[in-house]
Amino acid sequence: MTTAYTPMVQQYLEVKRQHDDELLFFRLGDFYEMFFEDALTASRELNITLTGRAGGMEEKIPMCGVPYHSVDNYIAKLIKKGYRIAICEQVEDPKAAKGIVERKVVKIITPGTVLSEQLLDDKHNRYLVFLQEDGSELCLAAADISTGECQWFSAAGEERLMAIQEQLFRIQPAELVAYSGIVNWENLAAWIKSKVPECAVSVYQEEEGAPQYFAQHFGSDDVADTLVHDTVEHLLRYLHVTVKADLSHINSLSRIAKEQFMNLDATAVRNLELIKNMRDGSKRGTLLDVLDFTSTSMGARKLRNWIECPLLDLSQIRSRQDAVGELLTNVQMRGNLQDKLKAIFDLERIVSRIEVGSANARDLVSLRSSLAVLPEIKSLLRYCNSKLLQQLCEDVHLHQELFTTLLAAIVDEPPFSVREGGMIRSGFDLELDELHSIASDNKTWMQNFELKIKEETGIKTLKVGYNKVFGYYIEVSKGQSANVPDYFVRKQTLVNAERYIVPELKDFENKILSAKEKIEQLEYYIFTQLREKIRSQIVQIQETARALANIDVLVSLAEVAFKYNYVCPELNNRSEIKIYDGRHPVVERLLEREIFVPNNTTLNNNDERMIIITGPNMAGKSTYMRQVALLVLMTQMGSFIPARQATICPVDKIFTRVGASDDLATGQSTFMVEMNEVAQILRYATKDSLIILDEVGRGTSTFDGMSIARAVMEFIHEKIKAKTLFATHYHQLIALEDVMNGVKNYSVAVKERGNDIVFLRRIVPGGTDRSYGVHVARLAGLPKKVIDRAQDILEEYDNCETACSVQITPRAEKETAPMGSLFASSLQQQILKMDVMAMTPIEALNTLYKLQDEAKREGGGL
């Protein structure tokens, strides 16, 4: 580093050398300045003026800056663009500095470690995820420092990557950090960027001798799985290195217990539009949108978690149902709870800001306001019959002493800054009151002093005043300036007056300014003491916050059931789903001029295990199948459902194959995307799963598609035995009802009126061999000439199909090829040598084509 630079620039370069991966915000007075390459980057990304600063060399160094009081807005913009920010503060008083002011980086802000309200969505968690691998085991640890939540998940064996991807998609991390050495890291990083585009991805290699934090946070190092311990430890180290603050609010570690929840992969979450819709990625038109009548930010986040993690245990589901049912019938209690919950601020994030030292007095007022309504909430819940509500009532702590202290200490509308006074109530601290008395008596003293000086000098027009630049002064007009006594010292000359100072006024000024400075110092000290008092109760406050979040969700579900006429589904362990007059919870809310047509559903492990649904496009097949999946999911999250009556068994997984489009990120065609999704279903579904398949095989030729569709159905029927809804335009497949036990045909009822059709939206028993595609084209407004020609061609195809119809016959096992066949042996050897698990879909497809070509050559074109 050259010594030709000024000391300040040398100091900057020394700090920057240690933070080469971050944009360095360097505090200079009231601004954060950026220099050199950082200045060029910040100027471009923030659209702020790029200037130059003399730095000791001939050419000025690039520089730009932002005001410290509005820095959060600028940081938010950079974080959203994926940058990391290092905040370098002045850590000593410039007045006391001997030479250049000491500065150091006090925190590093990354996408996963933000606490700024500008970057936090109050209804969504913001997770940092750390990923580590050891042999055949993958482990992730996730923390939201804005709420204090910390959890882990691990998976081993061939399915570990799939399991980790499912959790990553559910968590939707803001930042994913991988410990160096993960196999196939590049593929996983590409996957997360395609599924969660806003997630920042990086690789971490920690320094040797890093401190240990696990026991400090969780009280013990006692974790059976070494990889879990190490992954969580690395996560905590990363947080401490970046946040550089006390993180004691991260005090509870939980395992993501996959076996306790219904499994929903990324495809199911997307296709069912649980959290985001598929049109613009917003909340509108989603299940979350329909169910969200929460009153608190904590409740909104918890509701999302309940939707993403439906329960499997019948007793836990019933416990939630009982609570929702009681809140539904007790209208007055529900309304009162909603009113009280609306007064609750985001306690989880308030205590997090208190813990890391970024809270201000307004946060303490928000905490106080929240504590004020807790006695009324407990009173409302005290006599509930629901055991869950009783337990949640017990978990709400009153914190009465803390509330009383905050009420006495903090004014109702404190300033944003905690360093400039104005926070503490009069009467809370005797010393502070005395200082305020000195500072507030200045007007009376000035009036008396002015009268005294007028009498002493005989100048009746003089005035005693004050401004922030020159302090206190005596102002005398130009015409009277010759009459001032000798002890008047000129301080400022104006156009028509002179301003003076005298020793007595100067002494008073020092006394007042000293009092104001002491007030600011004492108020800040009192604030820090209050903060410490809150920190000592953080565990109890967090428990209260979690209880309030769960209460809020239960109240929300009861409100939805009341407003939309939902019923409580009966639970069974008979592997049976029977829904009477079920309705799609989202679609019925979006209909403005129509009444949603309800439908019945029966699925079981006996005579109606696989339902084939035929009928025209636009008639409601996809809506119906999604509806069934959503009602099952809502049941398992403890919600009531839109139906007249229902009895539903829990399912371990919901799989969906509904619609498809090209995946440009991985270079896959629509058909390849479809086949990949089907392959995942066939690999991971169990007999306790619910499978939704819509138009499997439509992305290829008719006979290829029909063959694939039938083969998939047979595999599910014979091998998996899962409950399945299968919509198809291949009406030839309806004949499977006659040759496969447990397969039933249903179709969408249609009423014909001449050349027109009316979709009745009713799912009725029996298949149909008509797709009504030409009728749909007519509804879409295609030219009459095109419609007429299409009808003629359709009749030709129908005649041909009648003559050359495909016969559905029971599946017969193929005879084994003769062992002496060199051709068969050759192919067999090639196939046995393949490492199928290491193949990409494209490689597998290419290999299949090669084998087919060889089979044609060796088999004489067969």
Locate predicted features.
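Coiled-coil heptad-register positions
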Residues: R382-N385, P414, E450-I453, T457, ...
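Amphipathic heptad-repeat alpha-helical coiled-coil/stalk segments that mediate oligomerization
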Residues: E206-Y213, N263, L274, M278, ...
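ATPase nucleotide-binding head domains, primarily ABC-like/P-loop NTPase cores
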Residues: T2, F36-A39, D225, S295-T296, ...
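Terminal-proximal interaction/regulatory segments of ATP-powered molecular machines
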Residues: N467, D835-L862
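Active-site phosphate-binding and catalytic loops of NTP-dependent enzymes
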Residues: C88, P111-L120, D246, R382-L388, ...
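Extended, charged coiled-coil "arm/hinge" scaffolds of SMC/Rad50-like chromosome-maintenance ATPases
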Residues: L494, E498-E532
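Charged catalytic and DNA/RNA-contacting regions of genome-maintenance
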Residues: M1-E326, G335, D339-K342, D346-E355, ...
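Hydrophobic alpha-helical segments characteristic of transmembrane helices
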Residues: Q338-L341, V365-R368, Q542-N550, L554-A558
